[in-house]
Amino acid sequence: MSICLIAEEGADSGALSSLAARWGLVSDPDAVMALVLTAERLELRKQDEPKLGAIFVDFVAGTMAHRRRFGGGRGEAVAKAVGIKKDYLPDVVDATAGLGRDAFVLAALGCRVRMVERNPVVAALLDDGLQRGYRDAEIGPWLQARLTLLHASSMTALRDITPPPDVVYLDPMFPHKQKSALVKKEMRVFQSLVGADDDADALLEPARALAKKRVVVKRPDYAPPLAGVPAQSMLETKSHRFDFYLPA
């Protein structure tokens, strides 16, 4: 995959070369999308829209740390959706990991979560965030035990991953109507990078074949059910819903 690769002052240019080789990235100085290694972290930037800022994964500080400390805990919708109960912490495969937010919330609550991400740039961002998280004194020990990344297509992972999880979680990209700054920024950058999840409908059947307990599909409230298959039950929030499917 071609993308502009930049090592900022203070960053390790050798590390950037190793990263490119690991994820199969080819540097294109003229590319609109840039993967930038700073002294602190790996960032994704849209060079023709610098006001959008940088996208990066940070499990230690910022929004994710705040959500871990002050969020709804087991009362969070995603926790309810995967079926977390007092003595039940499901093993989860998040087959459309993105920036890993929901996966991190579940891991912070005690679930083992295997994230799957097929796009090499997004996988590189996720891995960078994970490695920094693993090194953190506070969250590192449990993060290493509970949250891992597999760089593969969702279809391949759903067919081959072992052992099978209790829950398969799907959150395929869907055009957002909301105009919040965060959604706007991330969706614009992500859709420039990866496009729409045109093959998302094909994930439902293998997900149901893999999951031991349930498949959870996160959808905007206005989106049709995945693959046109009506959910067997659902959990609705203010702007989203979680569609539930039994194994098949």
From Swiss-Prot:
Keyword terms, alphabetized: Cytoplasm, Methyltransferase, rRNA processing, S-adenosyl-L-methionine, Transferase
EC code: 2.1.1.242
Name by which UniProt lists this protein: Ribosomal RNA small subunit methyltransferase J
Organism: Pectobacterium carotovorum subsp. carotovorum (strain PC1)
Function: Specifically methylates the guanosine in position 1516 of 16S rRNA.
Pfam families, per database record: SAM_MT (PF04445)
Lineage of origin: Bacteria, Pseudomonadati, Pseudomonadota, Gammaproteobacteria, Enterobacterales
Keyword Membrane: no
Gene Ontology MF term list: rRNA (guanine-N2-)-methyltransferase activity
Binding site for S-adenosyl-L-methionine: R101, D102, E117, R118, S153, S154, D171
Broadest EC class assigned to this enzyme: transferase
Chief place of localization: cytoplasm
InterPro entries per UniProt: 16SrRNA_methylTrfase_J (IPR007536), SAM-dependent_MTases_sf (IPR029063)
Cited PANTHER family: RIBOSOMAL RNA SMALL SUBUNIT METHYLTRANSFERASE J
Location(s), subcellular: Cytoplasm
Gene responsible for this protein: rsmJ
